[in-house]
Amino acid sequence: MTPQVDTVSAAAATPDVAQPYKELGLKDDEYARIKEILGRRPTDAELAMYSVMWSEHCSYKSSKVHLRYFGETTTEEMRKSMLAGIGENAGVVDVGDGWAVTFKVESHNHPSYVEPYQGAATGVGGIVRDIMAMGARPVAVMDQLRFGAADHPDTRRVVDGVVRGIGGYGNSLGLPNVGGETVFDASYQGNPLVNALCAGVMRVEDLHLAFASGTGNKIILFGARTGLDGIGGVSVLASDTFSGDESGAGRKKLPSVQVGDPFTEKVLIECCLELYAAKLVVGIQDLGGAGLSCATSELAAAGDGGMRIELDKVPLRAADMTPAEILSSESQERMCAVVTPENVEAFMAVCRKWDVLATVIGEVTDGDRLVVTWHGETVVDVPPRTVAHEGPVYERPVQRPDYQDALIADTPDTLPRPATADELRETLLRMISSPQLCSRKWITEQYDRYVRGNTVLAEDADAGVIRIDEQTGRGIALATDASGRYTKLDPYAGAQLALAEAFRNVASTGATPKAVTNCLNFGSPEDPGVMWQFQQAVRGLADGCVALGIPVTGGNVSFYNQTGQDAILPTPVVGVLGVIDDVHRRIPTGIGLEPGETLILLGDTRDEFGGSIWAQVVHDHLGGVPPKVDFAREQLLAEVLTAGSRDGMISAAHDLSEGGLAQAVVEAALAGETGCRILLPEDADPFVTLFSESAGRVLVAVPRSEETRFTRMCEARQLPWVRIGVVDQGSDALEVQGHFSIPLTELRAAFEGTLPKLFGAETA
């Protein structure tokens, strides 16, 4: 039985019908503008389309005025290797030898609190489809995770579901998870962050874009059937319990969190790649947030004509779905392609080969309207650009918070510091066993890091490294970083510190950083203080990219990350892509590969503890000024690391960030299963040397035979260095001479024991 629907003609004849636009997230003036655009009230289906496409998630209505700064500051020199940038499904970069890499990071924060497993799983699935839509084969994923306090009763539920969701979906797709970050902080209680990155590889000529052109070309929906899951996911996130019943009484209990099937997506990947190889696709768009509303309006808006869709031809998973529900559904594993009439049968044949359901649901028209019919009646008739690109843009109030001065003035300088050898030893053990700094092995071992056989480096390396060409050994490096604590103290500097660390992590593997993506996680845009944080972070990131000469290729904004009046720590996640001409020269993290290595600390160490993990773990303190950022130094450091890798002068490298030198030495020693002796400079404060979080520093292990050549290179380039110790392959301890010694077994127990104790040796 076909449900009664609200048609365009009915809407024109009944202008005074009350509509639930506020419940769908639209404001009074936004609803009035829709009526002005259409010259009448919208139909139920049109209202559904505008509400999801004009949502903060899809329209960027509060962030657009600030995001323009990325484009304004990107120079032609920075753009020269960029094949696709902001506005496309994902950024694409020419990485040489005819290869292109596409990469992007997206958020799935709110769904991952409501339904952690499916929220995280479909976050992975969604970003993978963005990469597929560019014409690439997905080759790796990463994740940036933020949870509430590690000892909070609800944190275990969220951690368990999110980690299993990421692993379950990514492992089933056969995609290696090569790195990321996991942070615990009370500000994320009730509002975890799940940011997933995916990278894909293709030949330069295989790039595909999302546009519908060519009058008469067919619109084909292929992949999974359309159900009721995910409706309202991008506009009004519901939290009813999922009953699994998509018909009758159970319908109202369906979650707004999407339900994923990785095996359907795995087949969809191979199907898409064969379609691309056969040149059967004119334009393509994945179905993610806002579902068909987004896919059809964006394809039509980017094309040179209009589009007509027959909605009753969409294969459904649930009985009696309305047009509004079909257009709003965020059911996963679906793609929408534009195909010439003569290629439709060949397209369908490929889909049949892979057992992928495919249906012609419409065609490109010569008009300028997006028209959607339902059993012959018109339920949508709109200018597509007004849905996809011409939504409201707000220049919201920006105000530096009143508390900012007091926060900066509350420095950690007066906090008690460890003074004796025993106190230094205990501080080190306390920090490496804290949830903030302890090993993430319990999490990462639930992910397959080496599937497909092209992973060269993965967690716990500074960056993931993937081989993309078996013949030449060409590869890419990926790193993601963020620091909400630094960004809270100074949003401009905090975003720059995240960029600097991701840049440095990529360089520490021997790769050359080439491009940036981001995911900007903030509180409510209706709070002027949050908008100030956002504005400053965007400017800091953009200015940093100019200083480094690498472009922002795209990104994502996630607002409303707060519980009540309490916003999360502002968390701009930055991803950096690097290129390495031969993965055989990659630099690992673990020391001890060469006998008698010398440990050298590159960069300057200063007394910088504002926002540090030491202040948090030992004193529960957040205040002061974050570490200084010096992008010229970061570039110099990257050049030295790349040259050292190319000339065989570096056998291991590990960047210094949270936890400082002490954390870096512990991680490098445990990774290499090798002891070492650290000799602190006589004129330096041992506490500052061990725990400072000054930026622009890397610990390198240099073969004894290369020490003179390497240090001369550093001096010639005016890069500060200090000989900080030696690798002692006959030792099973970390010794800080004149202060303390800790057996590697004790270090490992402290470092690796925390998460299993908190969350169980295995996930439930």
Curated annotation (Swiss-Prot):
EC nos: 6.3.5.3
Family listed: Belongs to the FGAMS family.
Pfam families named among the record's database cross-references: AIRS, AIRS_C, FGAR-AT_linker
Gene Ontology terms, MF aspect: ATP binding; magnesium ion binding; phosphoribosylformylglycinamidine synthase activity
Binding locations of ATP: Y60, K104, N518, G555
Reaction it catalyzes: N(2)-formyl-N(1)-(5-phospho-beta-D-ribosyl)glycinamide + L-glutamine + ATP + H2O = 2-formamido-N(1)-(5-O-phospho-beta-D-ribosyl)acetamidine + L-glutamate + ADP + phosphate + H(+)
Naturally occurring in which organism (per UniProt): Nocardia farcinica (strain IFM 10152)
Record's function text: Part of the phosphoribosylformylglycinamidine synthase complex involved in the purines biosynthetic pathway. Catalyzes the ATP-dependent conversion of formylglycinamide ribonucleotide (FGAR) and glutamine to yield formylglycinamidine ribonucleotide (FGAM) and glutamate. The FGAM synthase complex is composed of three subunits. PurQ produces an ammonia molecule by converting glutamine to glutamate. PurL transfers the ammonia molecule to FGAR to form FGAM in an ATP-dependent manner.
Keyword Nucleotide-binding: yes
Name by which UniProt lists this protein: Phosphoribosylformylglycinamidine synthase subunit PurL
Gene name, Swiss-Prot/TrEMBL: purL
Pathway: Purine metabolism; IMP biosynthesis via de novo pathway; 5-amino-1-(5-phospho-D-ribosyl)imidazole from N(2)-formyl-N(1)-(5-phospho-D-ribosyl)glycinamide: step 1/2
